[in-house]
């Protein structure tokens, strides 16, 4: 499924089953108006002070309140055109109309590069081309030019991760999402509480609502959804965690997008 965010939806087959053949057909673009999304992330320093989003920021995700350009910069001069690290980075998100937008920028090391496109949401970034390191040479941050919040990280942990690790997403305009799977894991045998939060931005002053609440101790847990949750266009999704001791936690979710 490679990138798994914005699969082209072309074809003429009508879906008729719920087994693995159906999900494979969606991934192969066999169904008109259907696409799949796989989101996953990690929070390396979960604590007990309050819920945090499962992303590299180790905090609640700072959801933007308006559309803005983005500033992209690395901690290493090697992440640059002609460098040994990341040379180009693709950013994926939503524009002012909540439609999917992507932009590929050429890195300039420790000097910030500003996008030409404006973004209302950012839900993934990845290294597209790289030098001899075959990934990023240091942490790359993507920051809102207006609110100055870091909205995405491409992490570096001995080696570059090559893309963001963030279990947050927003349903694009003209789509409806159906959540079919959740998974969570933690690094310590201590109590972790996970909650799956959504916010419908079609509603003025929309509140966050919890759709799933799970407790787990050390290891991996997965839930295949049969009573499937529905998320309408412009809905924010945020997988969050809290722990009774400092630990790392990861998690993700899968959903099917269907054209309205």
Language-model region placement:
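Beta-strand-centric surfaces of beta-sandwich/beta-rich domains
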Residues: 8-11, 15-121, 129-260
């Amino acid at each position: 499924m490679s990138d798994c965010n914005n699969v082209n939806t072309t074809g003429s087959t009508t879906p008729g089953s719920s087994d693995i053949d159906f999900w494979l057909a969606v991934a192969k673009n066999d169904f008109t108006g259907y696409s799949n999304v796989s989101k996953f992330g990690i929070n390396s320093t979960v604590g007990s002070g309050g819920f945090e989003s499962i992303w590299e920021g180790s905090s609640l995700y700072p959801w933007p309140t308006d559309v803005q350009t983005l500033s992209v910069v690395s901690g290493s001069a090697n992440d640059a055109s002609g460098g040994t690290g990341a040379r180009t980075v693709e950013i994926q998100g939503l524009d002012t109309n909540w439609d999917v937008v992507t932009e590929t920028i050429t890195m300039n090391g420790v000097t910030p590069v500003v996008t030409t496109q404006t973004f209302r949401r950012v839900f993934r970034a990845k290294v597209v081309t790289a030098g001899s390191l075959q990934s990023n040479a240091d942490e790359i941050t993507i920051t809102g030019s207006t609110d100055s919040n870091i909205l995405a990280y491409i992490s570096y942990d001995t080696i570059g991760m090559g893309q963001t690790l963030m279990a947050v997403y927003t349903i694009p305009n003209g789509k409806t999402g159906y959540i079919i799977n959740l998974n969570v894991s933690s690094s310590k045998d201590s109590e972790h509480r996970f909650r799956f939060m959504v916010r419908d931005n079609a509603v003025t002053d929309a509140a966050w609502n919890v759709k799933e609440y799970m407790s787990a101790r050390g290891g991996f847990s997965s839930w295949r959804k049969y009573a499937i949750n529905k998320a309408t266009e412009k809905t924010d999704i945020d997988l969050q965690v809290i722990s009774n001791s400092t630990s790392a936690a990861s998690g993700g979710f899968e959903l099917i997008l269907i054209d309205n």
